From Swiss-Prot:
Binding annotation for a divalent metal cation 3: E190, E194, E235
Species of the source: Pseudomonas paraeruginosa (strain DSM 24068 / PA7)
Binding site for a divalent metal cation 2: E190
Subunit structure: Homodimer.
Record-listed Zn(2+) binding positions: C114, C117, C132, C135
Pfam families for this protein: NUDIX, NUDIX-like, Zn_ribbon_NUD
Gene for this chain: nudC
Domain Nudix hydrolase residues, every copy: 141-265
GO CC, one annotated term: cytosol
PROSITE patterns: NUDIX (PS51462), NUDIX_BOX (PS00893)
InterPro entries, per database record: NAD-cap_RNA_hydrolase_NudC (IPR050241), NADH_PPase-like_N (IPR015375), NudC-like_C (IPR049734), NUDIX_hydrolase-like_dom_sf (IPR015797), NUDIX_hydrolase_CS (IPR020084), NUDIX_hydrolase_dom (IPR000086), RNA_Hydrolase_NudC (IPR022925), Znr_NADH_PPase (IPR015376)
Similarity field: Belongs to the Nudix hydrolase family. NudC subfamily.
Annotated protein name in UniProt: NAD-capped RNA hydrolase NudC
Residues that, per the record, bind substrate: R84, E127, Y140, Q208, N209, W210, P211, F212, P213, H214, S215, A257
Length: 278
């Protein structure tokens, strides 16, 4: 987050008037030529298919509210922009705000009714939780921990591509932590499953919020130990060892995947180490 603290997550009271508003639906945000933040009272007069409203924080000291819509209604002079576009380009503080808002919107949408008894859930004002008034079930915003790892072998790195990637792009390996395992155990298991090799000497590098839709990426470097690359069917389209001076197209600069690669390059060359965004 930038030093000015332009964005701070929080829970502004929806009973209060005024403030800014974001309109969100299906991981897309409403935008016009002036940006994404609309005067809240004006936006609420636009006859939007409002599903829920949540206070999500403050932008430059002003309260920000999320209007979660039932469907992405088209409005003159406005367009719906996918969240991922803000991750790739523009103001990173703004992306942090949108990523948080998107996760809150999806959580609220998915927890309108109690999964235990079917009663409509209620948002509690003093903390970010949905509560069932019938059976007292509490549902907090979902967070899915996931490891992401750069496997190294001297001046080579192991990179892979999924069928879902942009054509030609290779990245680090990643996978969700399963119940009952540590993140370190997840690294070893996922590398073995995805490419068939064994790793050791894990080094934790850092973490990054990844709101697509609700992951927390925990980044590692790991050293190759043994095994030949065998890509996991249906998950890995291709995996190869790449020399540091002959790398393929890589992930976006702001991603933790790219940071893991750039950090290793800097360390091998003696250059200044990059800073992980976010």
């Amino acid at each position: 987050m930038a030093g000015e603290f332009r964005w701070q997550a929080g829970r502004p009271d929806t009973a209060q008037a005024g403030g800014w508003a974001l309109a969100h639906c299906q991981q897309r945000f409403l935008q016009d030529d002036n940006g994404l933040l609309f005067p809240r009272e004006w936006l609420k007069r636009q006859d939007l298919p409002l599903l829920a409203e949540h206070g999500v924080g403050h932008w430059q000291g002003e309260p920000v509210y999320l209007l979660e819509l039932d469907e992405p209604l088209e409005l003159p002079g406005m367009a719906w922009t996918p969240l991922r576009q803000f991750m790739l380009h523009g103001d990173f503080d703004q992306f942090c705000m949108l990523g948080y808002a998107s996760q809150i919107g999806i959580w609220a949408r998915h927890n309108r009714f109690c999964g235990n008894c079917g009663t409509r859930m209620q948002a509690l004002g003093h903390e970010r939780v949905m509560q069932c008034p019938q059976c007292n079930l509490h549902q907090y915003p979902r967070l899915s921990p996931s490891m992401i790892v750069l496997v190294t072998r001297g001046d080579e790195v192991l990179l892979a591509r999924s069928p879902r990637f942009v054509p030609g792009v290779y990245s680090t390996l990643a996978g969700f932590v399963e119940a009952g395992e540590s993140v370190e155990q997840c690294v070893v298991r996922e590398v073995r499953e995805e490419v068939g090799v064994e790793v050791a000497n894990l080094e934790y590098i850092g973490s990054q919020n990844w709101p697509f839709p609700h992951s927390l990426m925990l980044g590692f470097h790991a050293e190759y130990v043994s095994g030949e690359i065998v890509p996991q069917e249906d998950e890995i389209e291709d995996a190869q060892w790449f020399s540091l001076d002959a790398l393929p197209p890589l992930p976006a600069q702001r991603s933790i995947a790219r940071h893991l690669i750039d950090l290793y390059l800097a360390r091998r060359s003696g250059a200044a180490e990059p800073v992980l965004p976010g």
